[in-house]
Regions:
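PP2C/PPM-type serine/threonine phosphatase catalytic domain
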Residues: 1-357
Length: 357
């Protein structure tokens, strides 16, 4: 995808709004949830049979309290899910966003679809906000036409990149960017679409194993480094403990939405270096799969996969009987451990429990 400069760009307006971190598209049962104080009318009705609980987290500036929300009931093979986010120890705002759609029945598909997405924004929250509001709409709209999960994920990512450019950069000069990690569960399969350095883990085999399901799109990834250099870009290694970065862009990720000054040729960019093309992973779900975890790089900058798995199981194996509360507490435990290890970034974690504990 190539981009053309829009007239003369005199300045770039970077957005850093502290919007709602968790965006759920919903057609909820109001009577069931209104007493929780979370109810909001949906922006758009995706289908006539959406089974979606309301869930939102609104951070306040300079508020380092971890925000946690969890499911209230099970959705087929999804026994529970939860999300926790924290702006971190250094940042005065949170650019992470989440969209969760627990289960939707589309007339075009035999099986219901569950959708979880994590967006790690940078340079302002504009791009992450845009993705949280639009990527799922692109996906479900395309899915009605294609009825193919993989194609719909790819098409939804491509359309989101194009529409963010035309509606935000060309109009508002919003040069913010965002990583994106989407997880779709459908017909016994787990689909992951990844752009950037957020990561998905799978816990399985009676707590004994944890597997990394996605690839981190970082300059240290040799395949990404080779791709960038072949496209005419450069990877500059950090000195000592410094972070390696790509040029043009001077970014520590090799794939991202937005960041159009790094992509527009007339502004010194290269559209083949920093790309928003997702890497797709497909896994058949088996009885040994126990949970899926999505987390932003602020978690994995300071924690190994095994540490995350261990802290998750310390909570899931605990005495609490309510699986939904367990999922929420597990998310919070991961975030708190990352903060204890002095993560300087925004930190967000989603856990989807696939097996009764």
């Amino acid at each position: 995808m190539s981009f053309q400069n829009s007239n003369s760009v005199l300045q770039l307006r970077l957005k850093s709004r502290a919007h709602s971190l968790v965006e759920l598209v919903q057609t909820p049962n109001k009577s069931e949830y209104s007493e929780l104080g979370f109810f909001r009318s949906p922006r758009q009705r995706l289908t006539s049979k959406a089974e979606l609980p309301p869930l939102s987290v609104k951070p306040k500036a300079n508020n380092c309290i971890s925000k946690v929300k969890c499911s209230k009931k099970s959705y087929g093979m999804i026994k529970a899910f939860a999300v926790c986010t924290n702006q971190g120890l250094v940042r005065s705002y949170n650019e992470d966003r989440v969209t969760i759609i627990p289960r939707v029945k589309l007339n075009e598909l035999e099986h219901r679809v569950s959708y979880f997405s994590l967006f790690d924004g940078h340079g302002g929250a504009g791009c992450a906000d845009f993705l949280a509001e639009n990527l799922h709409q692109n996906f479900f709209t395309n899915l009605k036409k294609e009825t193919d999960i993989t194609k719909s994920l790819k098409n939804s990512f491509s359309l989101a990149e194009k529409t963010f450019f035309t509606s935000q950069f060309k109009v508002n000069y919003d040069n913010s960017g965002s990583c994106a990690l989407s997880c779709v569960i459908h017909a016994g399969n787990l689909y992951l679409a990844n752009v950037g350095d957020s990561r998905a883990l799978l816990g399985c085999r009676n707590r004994k194993c944890v597997y990394q399901l996605t690839t981190d799109h970082k300059p240290s990834n040799l395949r990404e480094k080779n791709r960038i250099e072949k496209a005419g870009g450069k990877v500059i290694a950090g000195n000592g403990t410094g972070v390696s970065r790509i040029f043009p862009g001077k970014l520590s990720v090799t794939r991202a939405f937005g960041d159009f000054t790094a992509k527009i040729k007339s502004l010194g960019g290269n559209s083949e270096v920093l790309v928003a093309k997702p890497e797709i992973f497909i896994y058949p779900i088996c009885a040994e799969y126990e949970y899926v975890l999505l987390a932003s790089d602020g978690v994995f900058d300071v924690l190994e996969n095994e540490e995350v798995n261990e802290i998750v199981w310390q909570v899931l194996d605990g005495p609490e009987k309510d699986m939904h509360e367990k999922a929420g507490n597990a998310c919070k435990a991961v975030i708190n451990l990352a903060l204890k290890k002095s993560s300087s970034d925004n930190v967000t974690c989603i856990i989807v429990v696939l097996k009764d504990m």
